[in-house]
Amino acid sequence: MKILLVGNHTCGNRGDGAILRGIIDSLHLERTDLDIDIISRFPTSSSYLLQQNILPDELFLETKKSNSLVAKVKRRLMPKIMMAHIRGSGFFKNLAVPEYLQQFTDKLKQYDAVIQVGGSFFVDLYGPLQFEHSLCALLAKKPVYMIGHSVGPFQKERFNQIANFVFSRVNSLVLRESVSLEMMEKAGITTQKVIPGADTAFLVRTRTLDAPGHNLIHWQNQIAASKTIAITVRELAPFDKRLGVTQQEYEMAFGKVINAMIERGYQVVALSTCTGIDSYHRDDRMVAITLGDYVQQKDKYRVVMDEFNDLELGILLAGCHLTIGTRLHSAIISMNFGTPAVAINYEHKSLGVMKQLGLPEMASDVQSLMDGSIIAKVNGVLDNYEEIEQQVARAVEQERILGNKITADVLKSIG
């Protein structure tokens, strides 16, 4: 059986890396004879970080070739043309499928199925081009499985029309949390193919490395030397306007959380799930460095600058006492490796995943960061640590069972 995994942006976002590694681990757990191809927008860094061969995303490369007015018009018409050809009717069927999309569609004939790997991928702010791979797979008449997704918000009519078209035609849309389902229902998006599932980052097989790098060993020793709380931060854009919070306000508020944890006797280590490797446009390390301006005891605050992959981050987080994560997948990786985490939900996905785990109290909105109430929440976690640690372990195990069952069901339906 030959399967194509699409939708990975880059493993330079270690959350995307964990999502991809998890589905691969789960597929191989179920069947050892699978032939799996993977494509990514940034194949070089993704291959390096995942430690296996990854092919370039040809559709993404095409969008980088030209940004002329004609190219923009073509991209705007693309979904209408593709949908008309998939339907086999409509005015836009008179227009040819763009050559690069037809070429990609033809290449899909060698695969038994296409799996669109999860994450927060189908978001109105990201635009309709996110549906290109799925539209090509539907045109090629290949089974399409979307596994481990958060979808929405749905506040743009054009985006919603394409979402309805695609989501009604895929074999299954496996959601990793229920808040997305509520958003779909509220916006009138079809839910007939929805299956409740899990974030595939929970399916990463936790393991140690046979030959850990010296930089990993260094940070393991640093973390082991003093009781440690890990944090992850990010540039809030493009969500800052929806949140009504500026980047500086966010950083100042997070600085107060760090100071409170240091006063409680912890060192705080900033890890990053997104770095600028291979020209990736986000580098959380820069935000973490700026945060240092608001830390009072600077010798108790450290910023990790190394390029660790998601597995190495998990190994480091396993040595920490708690994770406070703006990046959802820092919280997921942390919990998967045995360390409780508080997730700051700047998007609905963090709250949704924590609800899915049965741990809604471990999600905290950005407002709680701004008004400082998150500090009391974190202190409450630390005061009841053993009980919460056990709750997290049970919840993660249930997610693994659910996620691996869905993988098994998908493979059975493919044949």
Swiss-Prot record:
InterPro entries: Polysacch_pyruvyl_Trfase (IPR007345). It is an enzyme of class 2 (transferase). One of its GO terms (biological process) is polysaccharide biosynthetic process. Keywords: Exopolysaccharide synthesis, Transferase, Virulence. Pathway: Glycan metabolism; exopolysaccharide biosynthesis. Involved in the biosynthesis of amylovoran which functions as a virulence factor. PANTHER family: COLANIC ACID BIOSYNTHESIS PROTEIN WCAK. Belongs to the polysaccharide pyruvyl transferase family. This is Amylovoran biosynthesis protein AmsJ. It comes from Erwinia amylovora.
